[in-house]
Amino acid sequence: MPTITSYFGFLLAASTITPALFIGLSKIRLI
């Protein structure tokens, strides 16, 4: 069970951090 929980936690973090980095790179390119 802890493995599944950490797996979903990793997916949640990845789905949150990845778009944030993508938006950050886009803003840097716009500047």
From Swiss-Prot:
It is a single-pass membrane protein. GO terms for biological process: photosynthesis. It is found in: Plastid, Chloroplast thylakoid membrane. Keywords: Chloroplast, Electron transport, Membrane, Photosynthesis, Plastid, Thylakoid, Transmembrane, Transmembrane helix, Transport. Coiled coil: none annotated. The chain crosses the membrane at residues 4-26. GO terms for cellular component: chloroplast thylakoid membrane; cytochrome b6f complex. It comes from the Eukaryota. GO terms for molecular function: electron transporter, transferring electrons within cytochrome b6/f complex of photosystem II activity. It holds the Pfam family PetL. Its main location: plastid. Belongs to the PetL family. The 4 large subunits of the cytochrome b6-f complex are cytochrome b6, subunit IV (17 kDa polypeptide, PetD), cytochrome f and the Rieske protein, while the 4 small subunits are PetG, PetL, PetM and PetN. The complex functions as a dimer. HAMAP family: Cytb6_f_PetL. Component of the cytochrome b6-f complex, which mediates electron transfer between photosystem II (PSII) and photosystem I (PSI), cyclic electron flow around PSI, and state transitions. PetL is important for photoautotrophic growth as well as for electron transfer efficiency and stability of the cytochrome b6-f complex. This is Cytochrome b6-f complex subunit 6. It comes from Buxus microphylla (Littleleaf boxwood). The lineage of its organism: Eukaryota, Viridiplantae, Streptophyta, Embryophyta, Tracheophyta.
